[in-house]
Amino acid sequence: MNPTSSNLLLLGIGGSGAAMVRGILRAYGPGVRALILDTDAKSGGSTGDIPFVLLGGNRLAGQGTGGQPTSARAAFQDNPALLDAELEGIRTVVVVTSLGGGTGGGATGELLKHLHSLGIVTLLFATMPFAFEGAERQRNAKTAAGPIEQHADVSVFLPLDDLVADAQTDIMGDALQRAVDTMATGVTLLWRILERPGYIRLDAERLRNILMGCGRAHFATATARGPNRASALLASLAEMPLLKRDESSPPVRSILIGVLAGDDLRLSEIAEISSGLSAAFGEKATIELGTVNDEATFSGRLSTVVLLFEESATSTRRGLDKDAGKPQSMGERSLAGNSRFRHTDKSTWNDEDLDIPTYIRRNLTLDR
């Protein structure tokens, strides 16, 4: 596959995002269309193997933000169109980053806002700081999450404490690498499902339709071997902190399940995984399923990728017209959330929607 032919893009923002992209490419191999954005010129690497866009070159001289999110936000706002040449033909972007620091925390919301303005659907994976990193870094991450959730179609926030919960080492460098590897493995499995679909297809265009305006999600992967591998896989998922839920958790609206195996994949295994996840996370939730049969990669093992999409207010705030795939106008967004008029016809005259205030309809600026 020619990576430049795909309408699916992997985009890492900030130093951590760049590291995640490189980890995913190592795990997947050739065939992933990727891009790195950062305020630090060193993230581009010396080989030029991955397209790189430097943010805020005139403002920051390629030296990074020094951990200041406001500097990263301003750097992106200087020239949002800087990356548009790399977005030609792109319909869906998977964004990976880390929150709590400078570039990831400050520029990711602006990036997602820009992608949304172009009609590009976005799935975001963002790591959240360790608890021991302190209140300020935690606060910065939560502050960054607000605009991210507003502009991303789907947001997956991954606490680093949960990513390393099953690590077999206490060495910090090894634990951090474990976190990157865990996230890279999950995104890599998702990429295989999209780009190498099996008998039950889940391709990039179907994913785009599933993701559009969904809001917050939870994400996990698991792998098992042996005669009872489907049961073992479900047991592993049940113990994962990334999928932990309690009485305060919003209901699960839908579950995306990717099943990856060799030629020995059985229908009974697919049924067991699907019914097991449905029973665990909500029998009323809709199921979206895709499979990959890849004997060379998955011989003897069974892997799964799970995305749980929650019922939340976030999805109703996303101003995306699902029929047209384009951003809605301000007036359309305001009316969409008004339940009084949800099931009534629009009032139109000369092709103008009279339910939308005149100053919005005609783009008039009001004196204050």
List each model region and its residues.
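Tubulin/FtsZ superfamily GTPase core signature
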Residues: M1-R368
